[in-house]
Amino acid sequence: MNIKVYAIGMVKDKNQLEAIKEYDKRLGRYCKIEMILVKNKEVLLKKLSNKSYVIKISTTGELFTSEGLAEKVKTLGVTGTSDMAFIYSEEHLEWDDHLALSKMDMSLGMAMTILFEQIYRGYRIIHNQAYHK
């Protein structure tokens, strides 16, 4: 699975960047993942592939469990989807699914860290590998 994580803005906190890099490294055994930070919605839309299954992440999306996200990723893979895009944005965009990490506001760096961790957790669940709750 090819996964691209898009967001408008910059991750400034070094600790959050290190955590994202660590999850990126761990995810390498399961998928190809890339974080793409852009300046605005127009740049994001130019970079977004029209063949990707788009999951918008915002505070107004549906709350999912880790198991629910794992099932979503697994189902997409089994049904032939090879490209996924997570877009962290409150902007109005077209999407295939709309999820929330939390109903609370958080910094971009925190949201990206949590999203990468949840994708990693999802793959551990899919492969029946231990992961603490």
Residue spans of the language-model regions?
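N-terminal beta1-alpha1 ligand-phosphate binding loop
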Residues: 1-25
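Conserved RecA-like P-loop NTPase ATPase core
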Residues: 5, 55, 115
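Short hydrophobic segments within beta-strands
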Residues: 6-8, 57, 87
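Short acidic, S/G/P-rich loop/turn micro-motifs used as interaction or catalytic elements
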Residues: 11-13, 61-64, 92-93
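Conserved strand-to-helix beginnings and helix N-cap segments that scaffold or border functional pockets
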Residues: 16-20, 66-70, 112
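S-adenosyl-L-methionine/SAH cofactor-binding core of RNA-modifying enzymes
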Residues: 28-84
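Catalytic beta-strand/loop module used to bind and position nucleotide/cofactor moieties
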Residues: 68-106
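Structured adenosyl-cofactor binding patch, chiefly the S-adenosyl-L-methionine
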Residues: 91-133
